Amino acid sequence: FRGAVLLDQGEFSLSGSLRINASGIVLRGVDKVKTILLKKGVDRGALIYMEGTDDLKIQDTLQVLSKYVPVNARTLEVASGTSLRKGDRILVNRPSGKEWIASLGCDIFGGGISALGWKEGDMDLTWDRTVTEVNGNQITLDAPLTVALDAKYGTSSVITYQWNGRIRECGVENMTLI
């Protein structure tokens, strides 16, 4: 944690956006009603951006072997030969295939206009997790998955990565943003 930038009470007008591009920085007001950041002008961009460097490097992609992983599960089985270790950061990816989209009725939106429906790959879900345990091909995650992984709708995957430019432990608190 680097520290907090404390803004006193008052209205602070901005003609552009604020950017936080390093880890451990908190922008803090003294009171959520009395500290106000007001963005003026015609710029429609965000008031505050928290952005690191887009240098994500995919290292390996492992197939999820579990046929069905229920909502709130924290364990899943991955392809053999895994090099995963406790503490590894991973992405769990659930594809949005045609069958899944059709099962939700989102492939067409009626009125004879099928171009508006969801397309394969448009609604893939990805969770960022940490491996807390490895037991053979079974891995345990630090947090549960919020949607089931069902092999009948496509093969999910576990992706190992390195992301040196990613920022973390940043925040905005106790202020009104307008």
Tell me the role of every PLM-derived stretch.
Residues 16, 65-67, 120, 161:
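Residues embedded in well-ordered secondary-structure elements
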Residues 21, 134-135:
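Structural motif
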Residues 25-74, 79, 140-157, 171-178:
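Right-handed parallel beta-helix/beta-spiral solenoid domain characteristic of secreted/periplasmic
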Residues 68-72, 82, 123, 164:
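Short, well-structured alpha-helical patches and their helix-loop capping segments
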Residues 109, 113-128, 132, 138-178:
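Cys-His-centered catalytic/binding microenvironment captured across papain-like cysteine peptidases
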